């Protein structure tokens, strides 16, 4: 489906809504996050210690890179995310389906 990367890993989303982390040098799969199974998920976005994905119901999900755990969900209500989020430091910016530019800080995720 789509991918993102950092210095050591690849992050891939697939058609089943799964998010995978692979070692860049060996290709070995290290974890799979299946909480969004059967959702149509966006391309992943790598942000510091997190990977972000959105789904068509209007939520942005935060996954911890270290272990693949889902650590945050930000709901947009009736709006959906259009395109891929843009990252600046710990702030994520995205356009919603109503045409509004929104932002969230992900620094305090656990």
Descriptions of predicted regions:
Residues 8, 24-25:
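Intrinsically disordered, low-complexity regions enriched in Ser/Pro/Gly/Gln/His and often acidic
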Residues 28-35, 69-77, 107-110:
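Aromatic (tryptophan-biased) beta-strands that constitute blades/sheets of beta-rich domains
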């Amino acid at each position: 489906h789509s991918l993102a990367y950092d210095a050591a890993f690849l992050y891939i989303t697939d058609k089943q809504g799964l998010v995978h982390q692979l070692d860049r040098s060996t290709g070995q799969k290290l974890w799979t996050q299946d909480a969004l199974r059967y959702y149509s998920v966006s391309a992943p976005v790598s942000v510091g210690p997190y990977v972000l994905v959105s789904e068509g119901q209007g939520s942005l999900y935060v996954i911890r890179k270290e272990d693949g755990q889902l650590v945050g969900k930000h709901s947009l209500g009736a709006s959906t995310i259009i395109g891929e989020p843009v990252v600046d430091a710990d702030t994520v910016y995205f356009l919603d389906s109503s045409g509004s530019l929104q932002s969230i800080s992900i620094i305090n995720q656990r």
